[in-house]
Amino acid sequence: PTPIGLFTITQKDAWGEGFGSRWMRLSVPWGVYGIHGTNKPWSIGSFESGGCIRMHNIHVEQVYEWVKIGTKVFIVGGVDGPFTFGLYPLTQGSKGSDVMEIQKRLSGHGFYNGPIDGIYGYNTREAVIAFQKAHGLNPSGNVDTFTYEKLGIILFE
C-alpha cells in the first residue's frame, strides 16, 4: 500500500520508461516509493502500483517543475490511517506505515526508543514483548488483535 505520513522529495528524474515521463522519490525509510507518471493512464485510480502515486504524464510534468528536492509531501489515509485495509498481524520483518504507527505508540508508552522508521526489527520486537508482558498479554513479540487493542488501535466500523 501507499505509505502514509510526512515525507520529503529526495530525488527527481526524467525517466520515460514504465514510470512515465517524470519521477520524484519520497523519503520513505522502508522502501522505494515516489510520485510518477505512467505509460498506462487507464490504471490511475486503481490498485495497480506497489504503493507509488501515479499521475497522468501531463500533470506530473507540471508538478515536477513546481516541486524542489526537500519539498514536504503529506500523504493521508482513510479514517483508519495506516490501518485502512485492516489490522494484520505484524512480525519481525514487517515494514510499512502500520509498523511506524506501532513504533510511535510503543514510544509514547515508554517501551520503544529506537528510530520511528516503519521497519519491524529486533528492537521493535523487544519493545512489543516488553509491552505485552506489562499488559498481561502473551509475550510473542508479534502484534496481534490483543496487542492492537491494548495500544488503543481500534478500527472504525
Language model regions located:
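Short acidic, glycine/proline-rich loop/turn micro-motifs
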Residues: 38, 45-47, 85-88
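Short, structured beta-strand/loop micro-motifs enriched in basic residues and often containing a Trp
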Residues: 50-57
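Residue-level detector of conserved, well-ordered beta-strand and adjacent loop positions
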Residues: 10, 36, 76, 91, ...
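Gly/Pro-biased beta-strand-loop elements
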Residues: 1-44, 57-69
